[in-house]
């Protein structure tokens, strides 16, 4: 979850968009938020028992070391325990960096506060969704392109105009972003 500074207080707080609990409730998932301030993320995840994890969006990789560190620990836990992981926007970016990829500054205003079409380029995803393209919302200031994908990452959704990667999976792992 995103880390914010509470107005009129000298403290950090974890925050998540209300869209997440509403969506997860609709699909009848139990929701447990993982605090960014835990000293042992792996013990916490083992204690609660998880069958899927989400790295949510909001803010940029590198904006808050505490969040970056927590999400790297979550990612390591997911890989070690073969737990499916979904990375959305910032979550996708930190996963790409974890696998030795990079992110770059977005110079295309069509990605910020807009919806746009992405093309699906993986036959398994096309078969699953029964379509060749999707309209997605977009709020990211940083992007992943075909030239800066990490090791073992395979894109499945890409924009027409600037070849921004909007979805990828890890070749050896149940990870979808």
Regions from the PLM with identified roles:
Residues 1-90, 97-104, 109-135, 141-164, ...:
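N-terminal beta1-alpha1 cap of cysteine-dependent amidohydrolase-like domains
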Residues 170-176:
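Beta-strand-turn-beta hairpins that frame and shape the catalytic cleft
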């Amino acid at each position: 979850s995103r880390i914010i500074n509470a107005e009129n207080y000298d403290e950090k707080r974890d925050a998540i968009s209300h869209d997440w609990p509403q969506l997860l409730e609709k699909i009848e998932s139990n929701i447990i938020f993982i605090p960014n301030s835990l000293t042992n993320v792996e013990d916490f995840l083992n204690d609660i028992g998880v069958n899927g994890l989400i790295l949510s969006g909001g803010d940029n990789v590198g904006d808050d070391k505490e969040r970056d560190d927590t999400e790297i620990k979550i990612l390591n836990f997911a890989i070690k325990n073969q737990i499916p992981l979904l990375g959305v926007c910032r979550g996708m970016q930190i996963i790409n960096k974890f696998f030795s990829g990079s992110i770059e500054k977005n110079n295309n205003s069509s990605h910020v506060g807009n919806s746009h079409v992405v093309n699906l380029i993986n036959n398994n995803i096309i078969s699953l969704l029964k379509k060749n393209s999707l309209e997605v919302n977009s709020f990211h200031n940083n992007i992943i392109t075909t030239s800066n994908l990490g090791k073992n990452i395979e894109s499945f959704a890409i924009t027409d105009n600037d070849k921004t990667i909007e979805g990828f999976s890890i070749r050896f792992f149940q990870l979808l972003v």
